[in-house]
Structures are given as C-alpha cells and as structure tokens.
UniProtKB/Swiss-Prot annotation:
There is a cross-link at K414 (Glycyl lysine isopeptide (Lys-Gly) (interchain with G-Cter in ubiquitin)). Keywords: Acetylation, Chromatin regulator, Chromosome, Cytoplasm, Cytoskeleton, DNA-binding, Isopeptide bond, Lipid-binding, Metal-binding, Methylation, Mitochondrion, Nucleus, Phosphoprotein, Receptor, Steroid-binding, Transcription, Transcription regulation, Ubl conjugation, Zinc, Zinc-finger. Acetylation by CLOCK reduces its binding to glucocorticoid response elements and its transcriptional activity. The modification Phosphothreonine is found at T8. This is Glucocorticoid receptor. The modification Omega-N-methylarginine is found at R22. Residues 1-415 are annotated as: Modulating. It comes from Cavia porcellus. InterPro entries: Glcrtcd_rcpt, NHR-like_dom_sf, Nucl_hrmn_rcpt_lig-bd, Nuclear_hormone_rcpt_NR3, Nuclear_hrmn_rcpt, Znf_hrmn_rcpt, Znf_NHR/GATA. It is found in: Cytoplasm; Nucleus; Mitochondrion; Cytoplasm, Cytoskeleton, Spindle. The modification N6-acetyllysine is found at K475, K487, K489, K490. There is a cross-link at K254, K273, K289 (Glycyl lysine isopeptide (Lys-Gly) (interchain with G-Cter in SUMO2)). The modification Phosphoserine is found at S44, S133, S199, S207, S222, S263, S303, S400.
Length: 771
C-alpha cells in the first residue's frame, strides 16, 4: 500500500493517530526527544472519548503490539525508542546517560501530563526481554501487556469533570492532562499501515521505517514544516573526520538489517555507553571532534548525488559539524557534499607533509566535486571571497618589522686588552693595538724602571695611557705580553715551512736525490719539541682593587701553584722519553721537583718581563717592592728574586732555559733509586747533551762553551738550596693552622707525601759539581 493511502484512509481506521488532518496529529517523536506534550484538538473524537471514560486510570499507555492490521510484524519497543533517539542498541542491557529519559514498566509509555518525561527508560529496556506476548486484539492490549490493574490510581468524579472542562477550554493548545477511554487507552500508531509480513529488518526495501513512509505532503512527523525544505531530501553525507548528521532525513541502514531513524538535532542527544561489544551508532550533531596531535589531515570521499544540488555547499573549518547542513574541518577547504544510501564514509589519512605551503596545496578531497581555491570559503547565498594568502601567517603586503640585529653593519670591533683602543693584531702573544706593542717593546729592551706616582691603580685607556707608563707596563704584563712569544712563533713557523717545502719537492721530483745541508732542518730537535709543549701562562684571578694582605696574597699564590702543578704534570708527560719510565717513578719525580719547576719558571717570567726587578707570578699578580714588605713575604720573595737575577746575569736563552727546566725535573731521586733507574740515567744524559747543543748554538764554535756550560750547571746546583728554603717556608705555612692559609687539594696531597721524606733525608740530590 502506498504511504499516502495508508495514512489518509480514515474510513478504515477512524481512531488512528495518523489522521489525514494535520490538526489531529500527535507528535510522538517529540515525546521521545525529551518532551511529552501531546497536541490534540477539542473536536477529535478519540480525545473526546478519552475524556469521558476510565476515570480510574491515571496514566496514558501507548502500546506497540506485535501485529498490525495487515499482520505485519512490528519493531520492538526498544528499537523504536532507540531509532527515534538516533541510536541503535544491539542488546537490551544498555545504559543510557545524558538527559533524564526513561520508560515505564512493561513497555508502556505514560503521558501523565503535557510535560511528561520518561523516567523509567532503563528499567523498561531491561524488562522488554521478559515481557509477555501481546494479544492481537488492540482493544485488550492494555490489560494484556500491563501487569498491574487499571484501578491502581482511582480518581473522583469531580476531578474528571474539572479535567474535561480544562480540556475543552484549552483546545488546540498544549493543555494539561489528557485522558482516554479504556478502549482507546493504547495507541497502535502503526496498525493502519499495510506492510509486508516478516521482520522489517529482513528486507531493506520493505522496511516500515523508511523515511518515505514518515514524510508526506503535510510533513506528518517532522517538526520542520514546509514542502521545499532542503533537509527533507534524500542524501548521504560523508564528512571529513565525521559523518554529517541532518535532521529528519533518511536513516542509514546498517548491515544487520535494522533501520535507524536519525533524530532531530534540535534537542541534544544523550550519550550511550554499553558494556558489550555491540554496534552502536551515536548521532550527536554539534560535537567537536578531538583531533589527534600532529599535522595529520583527514580526507573524506564523497559519492552520489548532492544533498541540494548546487544550491548550497558546506563550509569546512576546524572540525565542527553543525545541524544546519554545514560541516567544519581543518584546512579551510570547501566541497559539495553528496550522500549515498547504505554506504559508510570512507576516510583516508594523509601523512604529514614537511613543508607548510605544500600542506595547503596538496590537501584535497576525492570525488566528483573538486575543491575550490586555497583559502577560499563559500557561504550559501553569498559571493565567494578569498583571503589571498598562499599560507597562513604569510602576508605579501605586510613585511616583518626590522630586528635590532639587522641595523648593525657587522660585528663590533675588537679592542686592545691594555688600553681598549682599536685592535691591530696579536703582538707578543696578546691582542693589542700598535701603540701598546711599541710601548712594551721599548719598555723591555730599554730596561726602564717605571714608578707610579699614585697607588699603582691608574686608569689606562686610549686617552690616559700616556699619563702613567708604570701602570701601563704593569697592565701589559698582566695581559700576558712577552717578547719571547714572538720569537717562538717564528721558529715554529719556520720549522713547519721547511718540512712542508721538502715534502712538496719530494712529491714533484720523486726520482731526484735530496741532500740536506744540515740534518736538524729535516728532523725536529728535542729543543724544538720542548718549545711546542711549553705550558701557557696561567692567570691567578687576584683582585688588585682590594687592599693587599699576606693572607690574600699567599692564598692566591697557593691556588695558582695548584693549577701550575696540574699544567706541569701534562707538560712532563709530553716530554720525549718521560712516559717510558715506570709510573711510580714518574710520580716520584714530579713530587720531588714541583717546587724547582715553579721557582725556575717564575724567575724566567720575571727576567723576561720585568728584567728581574719584579716577581711576575701571573699577568694579573705581580709582586712589587711594596707587596714584598708584607709579613712572611720578604724571605720567600728574596729567594725567588735570586733566580731571576741569575738568569739576567747569565743572559740565558730560551733554548737553554727549556733544557735546564727539563734537567730540574730529573734533579732529585729517592736514595734507594728508581724502579727504572737505567732508563732514567739515559734520559737525563740525553738532555744534558741537548743543553750543550743549545750552548753551542748560542755561542758558536767558541772556547767559551765549556765555561758557559759550567755556569749554567752551577746555577742548577744552587737551586737545590734555594728550593730547600722555599719548601721550608711552605711546610711551615702548611703546618701552622693559625695562619689560615688555604692550599688546593692536589698541592696539599703532594706536601703531605713529601714532608716525611724531607724530614728523614730520603731524597738524593743529583748535582753537577761537588761542593
């Protein structure tokens, strides 16, 4: 039977809810959606009969019998309710969360008032599986289905008459409680429809829940009245990341054959949570889908006819689906949406694209409808506009503000470490200007004894550097300027150039025999290796602005000595042949000679930088006569000045200094000897010969070579006494805790190990000359 004929056949079924007149329609789905208001007319015969009968019954029962007038099997109540809510529950053990919705017991729907809400939905669904069979007689269905007597809620005659008066006075409006006679207390809203026999889920084409049976010319069951409403057309939307939900449209038929009726999205739908793995479709429009983190894009496949043709296109912005036919998703892309029956949306995951601009260019949907241009949003009934940007955040007409770094033309100029003038280069081992270079050279070679008129703290800058030569010279020494640094650099550079030139000539003429003039030009000597491994000058970090005191100076000297000992250990390990000794022998030699190395290096720096008049412990710590006058300072400074004065008197060269310093490392041994004594004697003799070569190189083939060798070796022997006196002062300071002089950890360990050996006389001095 056709839909229109089944609905408009009022002669066959006079008491049907689905009447031919629109004013007699009861919006059953509005009740399911959350309200319970029943719109009736005062002239309705069924309602009039309901008002005059059954004064004892208080609740209105709506029954869904299993059989209809055409003997067609009716859908179950749980499915009907679920379909009207936009969801299907495969099992009856379902928990409904959200709004307070419920059904009464035994599959009954009670409408006690115009604003009835279903409070017993959960119990009703749970009891549906245990409900008894419903008789085919619709008139007796109320007593058969309901397990309780109808006289449970008696009413008086006065209450019935008052309700009848209220009903008549409120005809055509949402009135109060509506009563029905016992013969019409249950509404079989589907018994007048002629359906084919069998379950509605058996055949999709014969399903009684098809939307074409629910939509007629007068929009029978839809809250949206209107013949030209585009949302009442058939269609299937497959949205990016989420299916589109349209109100009162054709439901999606799932694989199990059960029809699902999409509900109107004018009322928020409840959330459904089940405990079993059943198929549930939750149609909840207006919910923002939580996207995964990361630049992953969803792409939907659209097929079939458009929802409304070319009249309206969906908007796609930021992952929100709305009820007005608009879809929102990422990337500002628009496309016409189409819908195909019995087909789920196809989602494709596009992998992340590295380049930001390519993400906009390559993100597109598949289907018959092509996407519009990038950054374009189309609204129905409006002209198309575009933002004109190829990528977000990049605007061609707006330039980024200039940064502060762009205004600078280049890196800041480097300054002289002495006077803060513009730097001209590296002079005597320090980055200085040309003026300070010339000043330092003249001050050292001229052997001037500058004196400061103030407190040796004059300001040295570009303007006032000529005011005090003493402070300027002191600042040059503190920066680390040394005349010998330039000579050493030239020598090392010459050796490298000679070696490179020989290798190039050999590669160009491999068959040519090269006869070197002298052997040292080809093979680096031990002296040249000693020049390379010589440790750099270490700064002390002494604060010259604070008042001087014995405690501050001696503590600073001890800390500086600890760092110099560490540098001396590295230097000793780099000496050719030293690492071949036994490890215990290496440690013993370093413990016995650390004060020799410190005192001799101090004398050399003082001799080269101040001509032996000052003690240059570090570039930032120079002991002058004023500081020498402090308590406990004069005695040890006097011994140290002796070394620098002897170097000045003998005019020791740098090669001679390097050889003598190595011999001082090998100048003291234990009385019982070393574990590798033979190797030690061989190494020591090798460097004695190197000292002779350095003397010959300086003096030439002269008769004074042996005399100079005697003078230099005599100086080495005299250092044993000088170092012995310095060690006595150091030991006394270390043992006297009242002075509160600090010692670094490594230096304290060496002194602790060395004290008993010196006190017992277990040290053997290796002298060149007998006394």
């Amino acid at each position: 039977m056709d839909l229109k004929e089944s609905v408009t056949s009022s002669k066959e079924v006079p008491s049907s809810v689905l009447g031919s007149e629109r004013r007699n329609v009861i919006d059953f789905y509005k009740t399911v959606r959350g309200g319970a208001t029943v719109k009736v007319s005062a002239s309705s015969p069924s309602l009039a009969a309901a008002a005059q009968s059954d004064s004892k019954q208080r609740r209105l029962l709506v029954d869904f019998p299993k059989g209809s007038g055409s003997n067609a099997q009716q859908p179950d109540l749980s499915k009907a309710v679920s379909l009207s809510m936009g969801l299907y529950m495969g099992e009856t053990e379902t928990k409904v969360m959200g709004n307070d919705l419920g059904f009464p017991q035994q599959g009954q729907i009670s409408l006690p008032s115009g604003e009835t809400d279903f409070r017993l939905l959960e119990e009703s669904i749970a009891n549906l599986s245990r409900s008894t069979s419903v008789p085919e007689n619709p008139k007796n269905s109320a007593s058969a289905v309901s397990g309780t007597p109808t006289e449970e809620f008696p009413k008086t005659q006065s209450d019935l008459s008052s309700e009848q008066e209220n009903l008549k006075s409120q005809a055509g409006t949402n009135g109060g409680n509506v009563k029905f006679p016992p013969d019409q207390s249950t509404f079989d809203i589907l018994k007048d429809l002629e359906f084919s026999s069998g379950s509605p889920g058996k055949e999709r084409s014969e399903s009684p829940w098809r939307p074409d049976l629910l939509m007629d010319e007068s929009c029978l069951l839809s809250p949206l009245a209107g013949e030209d409403d585009p949302f009442l057309l058939e269609g299937n939307s497959n949205e990016d990341c989420k299916p589109l939900i349209l109100p009162d449209t054709k439901p999606k038929i799932k694989d199990n054959g059960d029809g699902i009726l999409s509900s109107s999205n004018s009322v928020p739908q409840p959330q459904v949570k089940i405990g079993k793995e059943d198929f549930i479709e939750l149609c909840t429009p207006g919910v923002i889908k939580q996207e995964k983190l990361g630049p992953v894009y969803c792409q939907a496949s659209f097929s079939g006819a458009n929802i409304i043709g070319n009249k309206m296109s969906a908007i796609s912005v930021h992952g929100v689906s709305t009820s007005g036919g608009q879809m929102y998703h990422y990337d500002m892309n628009t496309a016409s949406l189409s819908q195909q029956q019995d087909q789920k949306p196809i989602f494709n995951v596009i992998p992340p694209i590295p380049v930001g601009s390519e993400n906009w260019n390559r993100c597109q949907g598949s289907g018959e409808d092509n996407l519009t241009s990038l950054g374009t949003v189309n609204f129905p009934g409006r002209s198309v506009f575009s933002n004109g940007y190829s990528s977000p955040g990049l605007r061609p007409d707006v330039s980024s503000p200039p940064s502060s770094s762009s205004t600078t033309t280049g890196p800041p100029p480097k300054l002289c470490l002495v006077c803060s003038d513009e730097l001209s280069g590296c002079h005597y081992g320090v980055l200085t200007c040309g003026s300070c270079k010339v000043f330092f050279k003249r001050a050292v070679e001229g052997q001037h004894n500058y004196l400061c008129a103030g407190r040796n703290d004059c300001i040295i800058d570009k303007i006032r550097r000529e005011n005090c030569p003493a402070c300027r010279y002191r600042k040059c020494l503190q920066a680390g300027m040394n005349l010998q640094a330039r000579k050493t650099k030239k020598k090392i550079k010459g050796i490298q150039q000679a070696t490179t030139g020989v290798s190039q000539n050999t590669s160009e003429n491999p068959n040519k025999t090269i006869v070197p003039a002298t052997l040292p030009q080809l093979t680096p000597t031990l002296v040249s290796l000693l020049e390379v491994i010589e440790p750099e000058v270490i700064h002390s970090g002494y604060d010259s602005t604070s008042p001087d005191s014995t405690w501050r100076i001696m503590t600073t000297l001890n800390m500086l000595g600890g760092r110099q000992v560490i540098a001396a250990v590295k230097w000793a390990k780099a000496i050719p042949g030293f690492k071949n000794l036994h490890l215990d022998d290496q440690m013993t030699l370093l413990q016995y000679s650390w004060m020799f190395l410190m005192a001799f290096a101090l004398g050399w720096r003082s001799y080269k930088q101040s001509n032996g008049s000052l003690l240059c412990f570090a570039p930032d710590l120079i002991i002058n006569e004023q500081r020498m006058s402090l308590p406990w300072m004069y005695d040890q400074c006097r011994y140290m000045l002796y070394v620098s004065s002897e170097l000045k008197r003998l005019q020791v060269s740098y090669e001679e200094y390097l050889c003598m310093k190595t011999l001082l490392l090998l100048s003291s041994v234990p009385k019982e000897g070393l574990k590798s004594q033979e190797l030690f004697d061989e190494i020591r003799m090798t460097y004695i010969k190197e000292l002779g070569k350095a003397i010959v190189k300086r003096e030439g083939n002269s008769s004074q070579n042996w005399q100079r060798f005697y003078q230099l070796t005599k100086l080495l022997d005299s250092l044993h006494e000088i170092v012995g006196n310095l060690l006595n002062i150091c030991f006394k300071t270390f043992l006297d805790k009242t002075m509160n002089i600090e010692f670094p950890e490594m230096l304290a360990e060496i002194i602790t190990n060395q004290l008993p050996k010196y006190s017992n006389g277990d040290i053997k001095k290796l002298l060149f000359h007998q006394k």
